Amino acid sequence: MTNALQATPKIGFVSLGCPKALVDSEQILTQLRAEGYDTAKSYDGADLVIVNTCGFIDAAVQESLDAIGEALHENGKVIVTGCLGAKKDADGDDIIQKVHPKVLAVTGPHALGEVMDAVHKHMPKPHAPFIDLVPAQGIKLTPKHFAYLKISEGCNHRCSFCIIPSMRGDLVSRPIADVMMEAENLFKAGVKELLVISQDTSAYGVDVKFRMGFWNGKPVKTHMTQLVEALGELAKQYGAWVRLHYVYPYPHVDAIIPMMAEGKILPYLDVPLQHAHPDVLKRMKRPASGEKNIERIQAWRAMCPDLTIRSTFIAGFPGETDAEFEYLLDFLKEAEIDRLGCFAYSPVEGATANDLPNAVPEEVREERRGRVMLLQEEISKKRLQAKVGKTMRVLLDEVNRNGGVARSGADAPEIDGVVYVKPPYEPHLKLKVGEFIDVKITGADAHDLWAEA
């Protein structure tokens, strides 16, 4: 047999975008491995390159187009998938094919079958699949000690600034048994922190009318509260964390807070509020826009004093008046959100918000974003300073000669702050990546904490 026949096809991979896109990439890589393909770490070593794109805002579109262009220049054989693959320009033409006509194939997001069909067409799979080489938890692109668990795909909402439903479709909830099986496999593989993600975590099960499923021989509804409770019980067996992201403030979220207070899951809630003024929320077509969010936040903190709340906001949305913006600032002063991201409104091609009157000038949008972040810096510093002197459990992400870089239950990877840990005084104590340790907080700034082991 010749070397050419023996060679294992190698696929290069570029993954862009949000954690949900990262999970799509992990699923593709897992299937590639199951079918006997190998992965390449460079363009030169790849027989073909897959680029998983993002297409939400203009900057993400440009980054994706640049990545495709680089892959074409360096390798020449490129398959494109992801959100940008489902996006059309103003004339209704495929953006990617128009800019890069030499790509081999283009698919939308969450399109494992289509991607693999394109791979098979241009790089036939090896004769002998290697399913036994694929770990039960699949191929992961995150460090071994944390992983994302996607519980659904798509979204039923039609927020005026967002085009995600046009790219990822309506809500499709995964069967609860499949979600729990993946979670168990991840914990068995050593994952210490599970980050639950979707476009709308609170809506889990709505599309299947909260159908009854089964896990470990017990009936469990396809519903957010029952899923969270089951994940919490499972995580306890492995001494692991469960963190919730993209939670809309629907009434049933109140039932999750006691679970956090009891330690079943992390007291951390990522709630994308986007604004506070009711008129702006109406223009945004936000779900749950009628909720009295200040009262909800106060009630949550009364039930769970250690609760950390993360949220995102948009400054300078079309029609936002000075009074509406000041209303937002007043809300933030009262709410004292722990972790906050603010974006100056950016028109997204295809979003209905583009047709709203009274667009806010770009310089005003940026100025308002800056004011929000300046206020948040004061709030964050105050809330972090209150933690000095306390002992808390942290998860180590990095270890170096200066000590370690860890995260507390209040810190999600990549988007929140970190805890810098000094080396232990006792020589026999060593910091290890992926392990929990208890530390005493000795200092704080507006973003991070410092601690001693």
From Swiss-Prot:
TRAM domain span: 385-453
Superkingdom of this protein's organism: Bacteria
Gene3D superfamilies listed in its UniProt record: Methylthiotransferase, N-terminal domain, Nucleic acid-binding proteins, tm_1862 like domain
Domain MTTase N-terminal positions: 9-124
Subcellular location(s) per record: Cytoplasm
Keyword 4Fe-4S: yes
Organism of origin: Janthinobacterium sp. (strain Marseille) (Minibacterium massiliensis)
EC number: 2.8.4.4
Domain Radical SAM core residues, every copy: 141-382
Cofactor (UniProt): [4Fe-4S] cluster
Pfam families found in the cross-reference section: Radical_SAM, TRAM_2, UPF0004
Residues that, per the record, bind [4Fe-4S] cluster 1: 18, 54, 83
Name of the protein in question: Ribosomal protein uS12 methylthiotransferase RimO
GO cellular component: cytosol
Family annotation (InterPro entries): Elp3/MiaA/NifB-like_rSAM, Methylthiotransferase, Methylthiotransferase_CS, Methylthiotransferase_N, Methylthiotransferase_N_sf, NA-bd_OB-fold, Ribosomal_uS12_MeSTrfase_RimO, rSAM
Its job: Catalyzes the methylthiolation of an aspartic acid residue of ribosomal protein uS12.
